[in-house]
Amino acid sequence: MLSAALLLPAPAKAVSADHAYVLDGVTGRVLFEKNAGERGLIASTTKIMTALVVCEQCNVLDRMRIPGEAVGIEGSSMYLKEGEVLTLQELLYGLMLSSGNDAAVALAIYCGGTVEGFAELMNDKARNLGLADTHFENPNGLDSPGHYSTARDLAKLAAYAMENPIFRKTVSTRSVTVGQRHLTNHNKLLWRLEGADGVKTGFTKAAGRILVSSASRMGRRVICVTMNDPDDWNDHCALLNRSFSDYQICPVVVKGQCVGTLEVLGGENSRVEVLAAEDFSYALTPEETVRIALPGPGFVYAPAVEGAEAGFAYALISGKAVGKIPIVFGETVEQKPEEEKSFWQKWLSGKNKET
């Protein structure tokens, strides 16, 4: 497992998007970025957070009666009718497949009491996930000056959300029937790209085309985000395919592997082995190698106890830290007992005290 944010994004290549970000979902390595930290409108990709909050805080088997406030909402819709009864899961399908703004309002009222109350839940979750450049004012993504995110934050949000099995099942569904409605997922990548399994489209005139996608191949997931991208389908296919072909997940160290030695000051032995406390893998190109380095000053004071925490080792590529691995002592090194003083050492010590 990776225990630190990973660096070294690939240089920006030609994409039509104003903002883009590609994230390896296993190791957290940034595979590509372009203006990824600039805030912008995010349209219906907002609904990733809406769905996540519902999945985490509500029982999706609950049934709700649709209130009048959730009917006739502007923009994309699943065409809810006042008084009809649907499960939250059915509303999630309407939210994430049909991009229903009405479904977003219905879910917000059920889970948050009010739209405003639900927006606070969304912002609480954003803070919890460390999405410092994200703020929500509504559950559907209708344009608002205080409603924004970045390509980087959207990728982090999507990577987290795809770990939730209910969310993952919902966004990977191509089509479903809800009552008399046949809902088809707006995400064309589910049909066009090998391994595509989510997550959300978005569009307003002010925001342009926004797309957050996920693809999984051989147990590895990659998240891709573009903002204001007129050629998003082709860009995502190219970025995701390139990510899978150019990078492979490579084991760097395994738990229990010796990663070096430290000097032991005042110990019965002069050095002690340190072991990786967990596995560490990283997304690498064929040309890259990872070097493991121990932090300075390179020594510890005795005693060193087998299995006790010894700090961290750092994984480096071309001298740059890309992650850190917790390490433990591989053996016990006791403190060296104080040597018995000779007669003359004791005599000299006594004379020094007298003076």
Predicted regions span which residues?
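Bacterial N-terminal signal peptides
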Residues: 1-5
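Domain-terminus/edge residues, biased toward the C-terminal soluble/receptor-binding domains
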Residues: 131-132, 143-355
